[in-house]
Amino acid sequence: MNKALTDNYDKMVVKDKVAVLHFAFGDTPHTVAFVHVDKGLLETEKCDKAFMLTKSIDNAWWKNDDVTPMFDGDGSRSTSVGDKVLVGNTKYVCSPYGWEIV
């Protein structure tokens, strides 16, 4: 199977889609990305994965595999404490001590 088909299969069957929402630093709340994460992860692990994949370390985070950027413009800041992740119908906020259900 070619890479595009495999990636699409994974996103449809093997992975869940979570939304990353920027709320911190006085931002107007908005969805910045959808991140595909393994279905077998715990919800807080899905939040961790989405957080990690929306951090710019060696490259712009929106270029990471499994990330679909949803922002307007040329770029977006990295996900930080105070931002939120929506997993299914449950919203989590990134606190200094981990993930808390909102």
What are these regions (language model features)?
Residues G75-V102:
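Short, compact, well-ordered microdomains
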Residues A24, D38, F71-G73, P96:
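Intrinsically disordered, low-complexity segments enriched in small/polar residues
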